[in-house]
């Protein structure tokens, strides 16, 4: 299990290490650069996706508030791991945003898929049987964020306006 880029010479256990390496090697970017950073995010197995430090061991099985009768302590632990991986992913995204905050930059963030983590049935991962509204909600609805730096907003107000106008339009990440 490793994160990778065309730039790095070693695998990384955690996304934050990949991001640090990327910024160290690519700090001076050319004027027009497209960088794609593919993160592990909260991918199964979520307990492997974040450093188990005091900062990121934020959620526990006891902090899971879901009340399904079939939810076991072990399932609650898996939900907590997923929540901790999400918390860590937020920190990683914050690191990326802060890096480009003063640049003329646009960042697009999206997931390749969702994960079902005991949301409505005793199931974890991506199982599309039976296909229905809950499967679509938990496995196919994904975050899609477009962030523009202040410098970009000032230089390209027409593009920013078009982005804002598209906020509630449907989109698909399938290509």
Model-derived features: positions:
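Catalytic domains that recognize anionic headgroups
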Residues: 1-175
């Amino acid at each position: 299990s490793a994160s990778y880029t065309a730039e790095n010479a070693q695998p990384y256990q955690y996304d934050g290490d990949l991001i640090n390496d990327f910024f160290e090697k690519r700090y001076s970017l050319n004027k027009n650069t497209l960088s794609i950073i593919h993160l592990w995010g909260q991918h199964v197995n979520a307990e492997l996706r974040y450093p188990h430090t005091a900062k990121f061991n934020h959620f526990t099985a006891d902090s899971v508030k879901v009340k399904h009768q079939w939810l076991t302590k072990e399932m609650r632990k898996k939900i907590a791991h997923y929540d901790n991986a999400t918390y860590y992913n937020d920190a990683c995204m914050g690191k990326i945003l802060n890096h480009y905050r003063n640049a003329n930059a646009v960042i697009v963030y999206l997931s390749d898929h969702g994960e079902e983590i005991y949301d409505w049935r005793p199931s974890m991962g991506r199982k599309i049987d039976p296909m229905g509204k809950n499967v679509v909600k938990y496995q196919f609805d994904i975050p899609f964020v477009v962030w523009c730096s202040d410098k970009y907003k000032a230089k390209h107000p027409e593009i920013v306006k078009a982005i804002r106008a598209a906020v509630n339009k449907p989109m698909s990440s399938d290509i």
